């Protein structure tokens, strides 16, 4: 096991591993135990009691956080004609079709989100093997396959985040930066929490949310008391 740094050891001393904190306390403590020298990301991690192998328990979607994430997302849009013009007007960083396919096949990945109009999915499908593993493949469930490219681009730029349960039932979502006011982080937390509660599959049995923790990029995890909200 790797030896923890002195900074991490000091950070861990501030956290009671046997305690579950209120959302407000967890956010404040996550910021206080941040050991990174940069403006680290604050993240919420969920452990859900679901079986992702079942189609109706594959929790996935997107939500616009009221206070954004603190990160400027670079958006690539696959569209033609008027839709391409709409995407550019909405603030898309890159817009194209076959030319973008060639760039990506050549190893170009200077973007964070990919949006496509439905008619372009046959073209984008050629990139499934490279975009899929990176979580960049457009999907109707996250609003990234749409004719309303203006809305899609504007939402991403406004702080839209995607979430998807992994094979172990975990979901990780950024809720802002250490530099954010605590109130803004709490508001973002409440937004994603409400969305995930509403996404509970009707077939899920037992306690739906098994655990919630808040952490920073290199900080310790702080357990959240679900009875506090």
Swiss-Prot record:
Any Pfam family hit: Ribosomal_L1
Entry-linked InterPro entries: Ribosom_uL1_bac-type, Ribosomal_uL1, Ribosomal_uL1-like, Ribosomal_uL1/biogenesis, Ribosomal_uL1_3-a/b-sand, Ribosomal_uL1_CS
Function: Binds directly to 23S rRNA. The L1 stalk is quite mobile in the ribosome, and is involved in E site tRNA release.
Family from the record: Belongs to the universal ribosomal protein uL1 family.
Entry keyword annotation includes rRNA-binding: yes
Disulfide bonds: none
Quaternary state and interactors: Part of the 50S ribosomal subunit.
GO biological process, one term: translation
Molecular function terms, GO-annotated: rRNA binding; structural constituent of ribosome; tRNA binding
Record key words, sorted: Repressor, Ribonucleoprotein, Ribosomal protein, RNA-binding, rRNA-binding, Translation regulation, tRNA-binding
Gene: rplA
Source species: Enterococcus faecalis (strain ATCC 700802 / V583)
Name of the molecule in the record: Large ribosomal subunit protein uL1
UniProt KW rRNA-binding keyword: yes
A single cellular component GO annotation: large ribosomal subunit
